[in-house]
Amino acid sequence: MIRLASVGDAAELERLNAEFNGKGKTTEESIRASLLTNRCEIVIVADGNGGRLAGFVCVQLKKSFCYDEYMPEITEVYVRPEYRGRGVAREMLIFAQEYCKKIYPLHSFELLTGSDNTAAQKLYSAIGFECDGEMHMSKQVK
């Protein structure tokens, strides 16, 4: 089942995030706090077997005075290896889009992915995402 994450998912989300981004990037407590207080992020999860989660999607809700609409950006997509190839990521992404369309005024979705992640890019293209000519840049701040 695809659904919004709840505070009760914090421990399992910590395990998933450790698989995805590496151990020590966050804690169960910080995830719980974020799920309770972060109104700029929507977290979608897919239920797996035995009380475990199969994956998650994070959507950041960007809003600027320059535009009337929200600009949601999908920033994280992770599916455990044993659930890959079953349409779990596709289902979570579609759920995220449909949920956001119901709640927020918007006309587009943005998505951030690695330039070398061709498998993910293929999925994103298949559900209607396309390169928009924008370039994502970052800078380390010490």
What are these regions (language model features)?
Residues 4-8, 14-69, 75, 93-94, ...:
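Acetyl-CoA-dependent GNAT
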Residues 138-142:
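Short beta-strand-to-coil "C-cap" segments at the C-terminal boundary of structured domains/repeats
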Residues 5, 77-79, 113:
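Hydrophobic adenine-recognition pocket in adenosine-nucleotide-binding enzymes
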Residues 83, 87-95:
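Conserved acetyl-CoA pyrophosphate-binding loop and the N-cap/start of the following alpha-helix
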Residues 90, 115-133:
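Conserved active-site alpha-helix within GNAT-family acetyltransferase domains
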Residues 80-82, 86, 115-116:
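Active-site acidic-Proline motif in GNAT/NAT acetyltransferases
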Residues 101-113:
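Conserved GNAT acetyl-CoA-binding A-motif
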